[in-house]
Amino acid sequence: TIEKYLDAGHGACPLRSEQASACVADELAALADWQIDVPHYAIMPNHLHAMLVPGRGCVRSLSAIVKRLKGRSAHGIRLLIGGRGAIWQREWFDRWMRSDAEYRKCVDYIRNNPVKAGLVARWEEHRWTR
């Protein structure tokens, strides 16, 4: 499928480098400043899967959180790799989890994304998956 082709790191892959992936991981960790926990994520060569869990004190909208994450990480990546143009696509997709089963399914999906893409044999082998 086209998803497997893209997930495997073909085409434009601005997150392929260790430095770019580290930049995204740092920005995910920095969301704690806004009382957002990020218990699970997978930084793929050309996209990101992340579980964002707002704390009780979080007053930011999901849109503002994603805007901050994309903006700050794009700025950092551009400083690293140079060039022009977008790092992230404009759109993004969310999923609200209403049960433990949905939560577990989402965690499994995030963790297994690098495996399904053929990047690693087990999710634990992928440096940028939590």
Question: Where are the regions that the model predicts?
Answer:
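Short catalytic/metal-binding and nucleic-acid-binding patches
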Residues: 1-130
